[in-house]
Regions:
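Active-site gating loop/helix substructures
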Residues: 120-201
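C-terminal helical/tail subdomains of lipid-metabolizing enzymes
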Residues: 171-178, 186-188, 207-210, 217-219, ...
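Patatin-like phospholipase
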Residues: 2-6, 12-108, 144, 149, ...
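Short helix-terminating capping/connector loops at secondary-structure junctions
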Residues: 31-35, 118-122, 204-209, 260-263
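Conserved small-residue
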Residues: 10, 45, 109, 127, ...
């Protein structure tokens, strides 16, 4: 049996999956990432995925959101300073197309990942991003196949910054190789379908031996109107696009695994929330997101445990290794 973990994108709403996974991890004998054979994540989910694959505990990743979240989104002030900062961000967005500088995000990620490379991952990894110049997908992968000969040398920080470079929020990320990349959420905000396709098509794992845990960053629930104002339509179009992509990706995973008609293979965690209650950059709701994640884990733990957490996964040995890597 092969186990896959997939984590959606969603900005600061990543606190929800981080909290959910941390609560699940509290009863385990090893870090949660060690219980999966393949981990995929996009944007904020990509940051979580990389951390888990590198051996970090979900608890430590959650603490990163709690301690650094407000600073990353420049909401660590109040009063006149906060008001001025909000005006500055609006002006910055108009001038440069990016609401927030990336320096604080980079500093936070370097603090947990340092100089680690993709090849240092202890679990197979798949992190979607987008190459703006050629308008093509760019997926960071561990060396879990003979033909994957490049990414394992790349900095984990580069992969994290690339997948999280959400247009309008952060500027395009330029990697150490001078490659410009943006948020993988443009095409794979929910990467579960592509993770399952990787498992079946590249790793050649039997589809009927897969178990998949797919975790969202909440699902906005609201009424759909027959028409919207021009201003509202801009944000709604993005919402509709993301929802469509997510359902398409999940549908692909269902087809490949035979779930639910042939067997149970996919467990989708997608807690509903009132539309507009949790925006992608509102750090004032971190505690509420953590609350929701814990409550969801409390309900799901007895259901998920026998399928995903009876014992750690088989150790991952990459095909191509970094110098000094003695895994065999």
């Amino acid at each position: 049996m092969r186990r896959i973990l997939s984590i959606d994108g969603g900005g600061i709403r990543g606190v929800f999956p981080a909290s959910f996974l941390a609560a699940l991890e509290s009863d385990l004998d090893a870090p949660l990432g060690q219980y999966f054979d393949l981990i995929s994540g996009t944007s904020t989910g990509g940051i979580i995925a990389i951390g888990l694959a590198m051996g970090m505990s979900a608890k430590d990743i959650l603490e990163l959101y709690e301690t650094e979240g407000a600073g990353i989104f420049y909401q660590d002030s109040n009063g006149v300073t906060a008001w001025a900062g909000k005006k500055f961000r609006a002006a910055r967005w108009l001038a440069w197309g990016a609401k927030y500088p990336t320096e604080r995000l980079r500093t936070a990620l370097e603090g947990i990942l340092g100089e680690k490379r993709i090849g240092d991952a202890r679990t197979r990894l798949m992190i979607p991003s987008w190459h703006r110049q050629t308008k093509t997908v760019y997926v960071y992968k561990t060396a879990h196949h003979e033909r994957l000969q490049t990414d394992y040398r790349d900095l984990a920080v580069d992969a994290a910054l690339a997948t999280a470079a959400a247009p309008t929020f952060f500027k395009e990320h330029i990697t150490a190789n001078d490659v410009g990349l943006v948020d993988g959420g443009l095409w794979a905000n929910n990467p579960v379908g592509y993770a399952v396709a990787e498992a079946v098509g590249v790793l050649k794992w039997p589809a009927d031996e897969l178990k998949v845990l797919s975790v969202s960053c909440l699902q906005d629930i609201g009424k759909t109107k027959s028409s919207y104002s021009a201003r509202t339509m801009v944000t709604k179009t993005a919402d509709f696009f993301m929802a469509g992509q997510s359902h398409g990706s999940l549908g692909l995973a269902h087809i490949l695994t035979g779930d639910p008609h042939e067997r149970k293979a996919i467990w989708r965690i997608c807690q509903p929330a009132p539309d507009g209650d949790f925006t992608l950059d509102d750090t004032s709701r971190i505690r509420d997101l953590k609350d929701r994640g814990f409550v969801e884990a409390r309900q799901q733990k007895p259901i998920l445990a026998p399928h995903f957490f009876t014992e750690p996964a088989e150790a991952f040995v990459p095909v191509h290794k970094l110098e000094g890597d003695d895994r065999a």
